[in-house]
Amino acid sequence: MIFQRTVKEMVKTTGVGLHSGNKVTLSIKPAPVNYGIVLVRTDLEPAVSIPAKADQVRETTMCTALVNDDGVRISTIEHLFAALAGLGIDNALIEVDAPEIPIMDGSASPWVFLLQSVGIQEQSAAKKYLRIKDTIRVEDGDKWAELKPFNGFRVDFAIDFNHPEIARSQQHMVMDFSTSAFVRDISRARTFGFMRDIEYLRANNLALGGSMENAVVLDEYKVLNPDGLRYEDEFVKHKILDAFGDLYVAGHAIVGEFCAFKTGHALNNQLVRALLAQQDAWELVSFEKDEAPVSFSVPAGAVFA
């Protein structure tokens, strides 16, 4: 049986909020089986809990944000959630003392390191996967995203940026998910932005914590970061990283193929909502270890500390 997972013990870190520029402290704590991922705003009195569910995603401009019925928000969850998804963590209590998750270096890599350093604990209940039975598709103009049946988790993703540096890079990628492939090929890809947008955002008191320490920054012609790119195709890989995080608010790892063209946070969330609403298009399944699709098989000692 493949079992549910949580962290072995509490781990804490500090960072900067991308939009506020303020210091943020975040803790990740173990949680019991079938708990899911729950985030808590500890800076409020009383503290406010928000479960990481698709219908709690109510803001998708520049990031993915959970917002409860009272308007309490936790923004920029996608990179942390990509790490949780990539390492197969089902249950965790995440406490944060600000309205946004710290941006760290703009990728999922610091979260992967944090989670692997504290260790991942198998629990005493079967892990449930969301298996796609029928194709679900959403569109917005020429942008689209779909989930369709596949025995594993495959991503087929394309971007289309009219920028010389991005156009020179590979803008299409197909990958079969595994934890090792995620950590090696996806987790280090950083968010990227354009100088012209950053100037506008800062004029509106946004992106105040953004810098070349936590983003790939481009002018009209080139990458401005002195050290350049981490991957030749870092742009499409970061969009895949975002999608991993955005899809994880489905509540379970997905068994299926995710295909997308020019999608972003809004369309990713629309896809998850459309999927969950069409209950005959999916089923929850568990696997014996020797029966699991290769995407979800865990090599001995690869993740658990």
From Swiss-Prot:
GO terms for molecular function: metal ion binding; UDP-3-O-acyl-N-acetylglucosamine deacetylase activity. InterPro entries: Ribosomal_Su5_D2-typ_SF, UDP-acyl_GlcNac_deAcase, UDP-acyl_GlcNac_deAcase_C, UDP-acyl_N-AcGlcN_deAcase_N. Pathway: Glycolipid biosynthesis; lipid IV(A) biosynthesis; lipid IV(A) from (3R)-3-hydroxytetradecanoyl-[acyl-carrier-protein] and UDP-N-acetyl-alpha-D-glucosamine: step 2/6. It is an enzyme of class 3 (hydrolase). Its EC number is 3.5.1.108. It catalyses: a UDP-3-O-[(3R)-3-hydroxyacyl]-N-acetyl-alpha-D-glucosamine + H2O = a UDP-3-O-[(3R)-3-hydroxyacyl]-alpha-D-glucosamine + acetate. One of its GO terms (biological process) is lipid A biosynthetic process. Gene3D superfamilies: lpxc deacetylase, domain 1, lpxc deacetylase, domain 2. The keyword ATP-binding does not apply. It comes from the Bacteria. The active site is at residue 265. Its cofactor is Zn(2+). SUPFAM superfamilies: Ribosomal protein S5 domain 2-like. Zn(2+) binds at residues 79, 238, 242. Keywords: Hydrolase, Lipid A biosynthesis, Lipid biosynthesis, Lipid metabolism, Metal-binding, Zinc. Signal peptide: none annotated. One of its GO terms (cellular component) is membrane. Belongs to the LpxC family. Catalyzes the hydrolysis of UDP-3-O-myristoyl-N-acetylglucosamine to form UDP-3-O-myristoylglucosamine and acetate, the committed step in lipid A biosynthesis. PANTHER family: UDP-3-O-ACYL-N-ACETYLGLUCOSAMINE DEACETYLASE 1, MITOCHONDRIAL-RELATED. This is UDP-3-O-acyl-N-acetylglucosamine deacetylase.
